[in-house]
C-alpha cells in the first residue's frame, strides 16, 4: 500500500520542469513598445538592442537607427518592463508545507547569522516557475525563524541549480526585532494589548551578541567562530542588515541600534507604521521593504485602507520603499507582486512610481541596481514584454521574457492545465 501511495504522490508532483534557457547567442532588437524604465521614466516608442546578455542600446525608435539584428521583435502597442524583483522571499526553500522534508526555510536556535539560504534554494521548485509568467524574474531568498534568521542571497529564477541561479550571495543578515507589545488571546478570540516586559532584556541580548561578534572580528587571535564570521561586512557595507519590525517604537529603536553599532546599510522589513518615523528613516538613509499590501489593518480601530496607502505615505516623505510578500501562502502568492504595486497606484501613486516599488527601488535596497531593476544601456537584459499594463491582472499578459538576455520559458503546470481544459471546453462547443 505504501508503495502505491508513493507512486501516486510522484505522479501528482512529477510534471516536467521547464528547461533553463541557453546563453544568448543571437542579437535581439525589440521595436515599438512603450518602455517603462523602472526609474520613473517612459519611452513611448522604444528601441531596445540586446547583445551578449546586456542592453546595448535603448532609446526613442523615432530618432535612433541601429544595425540589423539576428532577431527583431515587433512590440508595437505593447509594453516593456524590467524584470520584477521579489525581496524577502522563501521561494525554493519550501515546496509543500505539509511535507516536513521539503521545508528548509528555518533552522533551530536563536542566533544563526551563518545559516545561508542559498545552499538550500531549490532552483527546480514548481513554485518558482509560476512566478515568471507574471514578470517576477528575480528574488531575494531569505531564511526565517529565530532572532537572527540567517543570511539571504539574490537569485534569478531560471536556472539548473543554486550555483547557476545566484546573482549576489550573502547580501545581508536578517534580524527579527522584538515586539514592544503583544496581543492576548488568539485569532478567533483576541484579547487586549499587553506590554512586552521582556522587550528591553531582549534588545540587550541582541546588543550583547553584536558586541561579541564585532569584538571577535577585531581580534587577531580569537578561536574561529563561524556564526561571528558571518557578521563580517555589516559595518563596512558589504552586507546589509535587514530588521523585521512593524511598530513605531521598534522602528525607532532599530534605527538607534544602527547608529550605535555603526551599521552602514540597514533596511526595515515590514514597516507597517514606518510612516510615523519617516523623517528619522530618511535622515539615516534607511529604506523599507513594506509589509504585504493585500492585507488587513493591524488594529481594529485604524483606517481599513492603510495597507494600500502605506507606500504613498513613505514615498511622499522621501523614504526609499519597495514591496515584499512575506506572510501566509507567501511562495504561492509571489506571482501577485505586480498587482500589489497596481493597488498602490490605485491609492495615490502614479503608475511609474508604483512600478519602481518592484523594480528600481527593490534593486537599490538589495544592492543590485548596478545591473538590475531598470532598463538602461549596459545593464542586464532582464526584462519582459506584456500585451498591456503589467500591474493590472487583466492585462498582465506576457509574450516574451528575458533573463540576462536569455529568452526563458513562460510555461508552468498552471499554463499546461489552462491549455488542457481550454481545449476541452472548445471541443464541447463544436
Where are these regions (language model features)?
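Polyanionic/metal-chelating signatures
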Residues: 127, 134-252, 256-265
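Divalent metal-coordination and catalytic microenvironments
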Residues: 33, 48, 53, 77, ...
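Histidine-rich, glycine-flanked metal-binding segment
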Residues: 21-22, 35, 39-81
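Bacterial Sec-dependent N-terminal signal peptides
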Residues: 1-23
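Extended hydrophobic/aromatic segments used for targeting, binding, or gating
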Residues: 249-255, 259-316
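His/Asp/Glu-enriched, well-ordered alpha-helical/loop segment
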Residues: 32, 96-97, 102-108, 114, ...
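C-terminal cap of metal-dependent C-N hydrolases
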Residues: 33-36, 44, 376-421
